[in-house]
Amino acid sequence: MRTPLRWSGAFVATGAIAWALATPQPDTLVAGDGQTAAFRGKDGRLAVLRAGRDTFAIKEWLAADADARTPKDGSLGNGVTCDAVGCIGRLADSRLVSIVVGIEAFAEDCARAAVVFSDRESPADCNAMLVDRAIWQSYGAVALQWTGDRFTQTVALPRSQDRP
């Protein structure tokens, strides 16, 4: 005998799908070694700022974003400009995001960018949201999300958790 209870599974599934779709996507991501970062551009897709060769992190970010591209896809560099001391790109709201490779890039990038990633120690007077050596060595990989007036961080190794 069929009862109205059979519809409860559909209700739960619909709720789970709605909850998953409502989960906000991060605006920027940085790998646990601080050498590879990604940002969400104007088209809503991830673009990659590469200093390192961490294709594993890129593959995982793309999979989590339901993006069929591979880490070697040329379109991951769309909107990214690089030189010898770093790379820059634009977030969806047109603010700059950068990854610093050479210390000489800090002065300009800290003054112009909203977010600066680096695997180096950064200067104390940087005006940007920084994810530098001190951050990723303490917390591992970092995701940043713009909440309207500031970035919120989600880290892989929060201090509130005792992990081996």
Task: Map each language-model feature to its residues.
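Transmembrane helix-bundle segments that form internal channels/tunnels in multi-pass membrane proteins
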Residues: 1-42
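Extracytosolic and intramembrane catalytic regions of membrane-associated proteins
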Residues: 40-164
